[in-house]
């Protein structure tokens, strides 16, 4: 969200040491645990002759993460000319998505991830949220110390968005319906009707892709990746 990791390998080094994720105290601790599995350590050296190091571990994770692509969503198929890939209601949702300027920030191959934008462009999100501000709420400012970057966050990509809840950097929205309503209000200054929310949400569901030829669902996504 704040752009602190400059490369995918840098990102891979974060969760192992995060106290609320994997909670290791250091990479020395991680390396010692991995070396205790002699079979794994031996297999690792067939790819990385100098063995288990922080650089090699994060490089390996980076290479795995690069395989986690999910092409061939219904929207992809529609863009390639298959008019039957999405319904008229979903297409209306796409038109609303563009009408209310969602596509201005959620652009590119992943419908996001290209820029840092203010959270609460048209209305003060943090005041309305009613929670005490945290360091994480500073967003990009944490890294740049530039006042213009306070509350500015990387725009998330929208592929597979139905499976990536809870939403926002603070995880305060658990449904896509609520996230769509809020983003229209806080970023575009628009109060959507229930029908408009439903149609935009229908469009967003067309962005769910396939992994190894299987459509991602809440029930199968972990199994498919674990079996990679």
Predicted segment positions?
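Periplasmic c-type cytochrome electron-transfer domains
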Residues: 1-228
